[in-house]
């Protein structure tokens, strides 16, 4: 079973400067529309070959548009031995609905 976090709880953890890595697994076209500040851009299909960029020793929150793809990505990472992954429930849609910050991607 995949552990999940809601937008408000994640926002609070980030405000408290907790050591959380955000990973945006959406496509580059989706990311171009905006992303959560300071998130690592790692399209879902590249996770198997770029897994080494995801630390096992800190909490990692994976998100996509609605939370469905990120749920699958979390399940995959858990199968690979990652115990500290969380799915952002409702994805960036829920984040935006709560009025939380979205920024343009760098580069």
Swiss-Prot record:
Alphabetized GO MF terms: transferase activity
Active site: 64 (cysteine persulfide intermediate)
Gene3D superfamilies noted in UniProt: Rhodanese-like domain
Pathway: Energy metabolism; sulfur metabolism
Keywords: Cytoplasm, Transferase
UniProt induction comment: Up-regulated under sulfur-oxidizing conditions (at mRNA level), i.e. when grown on reduced sulfur compounds such as sulfide, thiosulfate or elemental sulfur.
Enzyme Commission number, as recorded: 2.8.1.-
Enzyme class: transferase
SUPFAM superfamilies on file: Rhodanese/Cell cycle control phosphatase
Pfam families: Rhodanese
Keyword Protein biosynthesis among record annotations: no
Subcellular location: Cytoplasm
Knocked-out gene: effects: A mutant strain lacking rhd_2599, tusA and dsrE2, although not viable in liquid culture, is clearly sulfur oxidation negative upon growth on solid media containing sulfide, and shows massive accumulation of intercellular sulfur globules.
Keyword DNA-binding in annotation: no
Positions of disulphide bridges: none
Residue ranges of domain Rhodanese in the record: 16-104
Function (record text): Sulfur carrier protein involved in sulfur trafficking for oxidative dissimilatory sulfur metabolism. Component of a sulfur relay system that starts with the sulfur-mobilizing rhodanese-like protein Rhd_2599 (Alvin_2599), which transfers the sulfur from a low-molecular-weight thiol, maybe glutathione, to the TusA protein (Alvin_2600); TusA serves as the sulfur donor for DsrEFH, which persulfurates DsrC; persulfurated DsrC very probably serves as a direct substrate for reverse-acting sulfite reductase, DsrAB.
Quaternary assembly: Monomer.
Protein name: Sulfurtransferase Alvin_2599
